[in-house]
Amino acid sequence: MTFDEMSYQPLGDKKNSAFFEEYRQKIYERRKSSGLSELLGPMRAVVVQVEHGDAVSYLCELYLMGPYRLAAAFESETHRVFLLKSKPEFPRLIVMEPLVSEYRDEITLLNSLYPLAAAKPNARYVGEVFAALDQLEVRRILESHSIRFNYHHETKNPLITDSAFVFSFPSDYSGNRIGYCQVDLDDVDALGLGTQIQLPSEVLSQLDLVDEFSRQHRLDPLVMGLDHMATRVLAGEREDAILEFLTMSNYYFWGAYNIADMNSSTNVNRSSSVEDDKQSPAKVFTANNTPSFVNSFDDLPMPTEDFVRNFGRRMHHLAYEVCDGDHGSGEKNVDYVVGTLKEKGVAFLANVVGECLDEPNLKQIFSKHSAYSILITEYVERCHGYEGFFTKSNVAALTAAAGQDEQYRHGRVFD
C-alpha cells in the first residue's frame, strides 16, 4: 500500500504555525511535480569528520559502541577517508581525518564561533548522503528551489566536490550538509574518495582486538544499526530547519511533541520508502520552545538552546537500536549492553531511563560526548513492539542529563 504523505496527519501535541503547514504541503507537491520524489532513494551514508590524529581512536570507539566495521580506507590531497559498513541494507559511515593538524576549511570556521566546539575545530558531523538515480538532475532541481551546492573552487576537501557525491552547502539552520550519490557505495573504485590505502598492521590489530571483545561479549547481534539522529537548532529556526530538510529529501514530517519539563520539542521526520527505519534512519530536530533572552523572564530550563549557543547548530546524537529481549544475565538487552560498555570504560550521562514490563515501552540512555566526534551515542530498546522514538518522560530525563554535561561557565552566565 502506497504511503500518502499529502493526507497523512502528523502525530503529537506540538502546534506548528499556519506557515509551516502551508509550506509542508507545498513542498510535498513540488517534490512530486518536479520529479525529485522519483529520483531520491533511502539514506546511504552518514559522514563525520574528526581532528588530525583522532581517526584510529574514533574507529576503535565505533567498533566498541556499534556495528560499523572498516570496509576500505583512502587518502586524498587533504584527508584520510575511512568507509565503514554494517548490514548491506543499512547506511554506510564515512569518517574523514585531515592529513595535517593545521587544516582549515568551513568546518573549522564554523566550529570556532562556539566556545565548546572550538576546542575540536575540525570535529563535526558533516551530513547524510541519499541515493539518487541521477545526482546531477537532483542538484539541478534543488538549485531551482534555491538550495546551494558546493563546486570544486569553493572548498578544499575533494570529498565534498570532486568525489562521486554532490553536496549542498552547510545548512544555515542546522549546520548539516546533504549529499547525493548515484553509484553503489560498495563499488569503492567508483567513489572517488582518493587512493585506496592499507592501514598499518598495528592499527588493524587494535581494531581486531575491539572487534573480538564485541564478539566475545555478544554485543554484535544486540546493537543493530542507526535508528535515528537528532540535530539541535535554535528555538526560532525549528520550522525552517524541518522544511528545508523536507525540501531536500524524500522524508515526511512524522510528528512533534512538546517536552514541557525541558521547555523544548522533539520533531521527527521519517522515510516512507523503507519498512525498517534502520535502512534510512529518522531525522529528528530538537529546539527550545522560547529563545534564551525571552526564556530569562520565566527562568525555565533550556538545555537545548544552551547546547546550540555553546556548540552551534549541529548534530547532537546518533541513536542505535538495541534488539528487544531479556538477556541471559537477567536484565534487558540494553542494560546488558550498557553495563558491558561501562566495564570497558565507556562513560554515560545517567542511568538507563524507561522501563520494560508487560506493556510496550522504551528504554534509552545517552553516552557522554565522544572525545573525537563530539557526538553522543544513544541506545534505545523498543520493548514489546513499541512504536515511536521516545516517551516524554524519557526525553526529559535524557535532555536534562545532557544539559548538565554541556554547560559553559563564563562571567555571571552559567549555560
Residue ranges and their predicted role:
Residues 38-43, 50-104:
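Hydrophobic, helix-prone linear segments
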Residues 97-99, 105-107, 181-183, 279-297, ...:
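Amphipathic N-proximal alpha-helical interface segments
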Residues 204-212, 222-227, 231-245:
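Charge-rich interaction segments
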Residues 248, 252-325:
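Long, well-ordered mid-to-C-terminal structural blocks that present hydrophobic/aromatic surfaces
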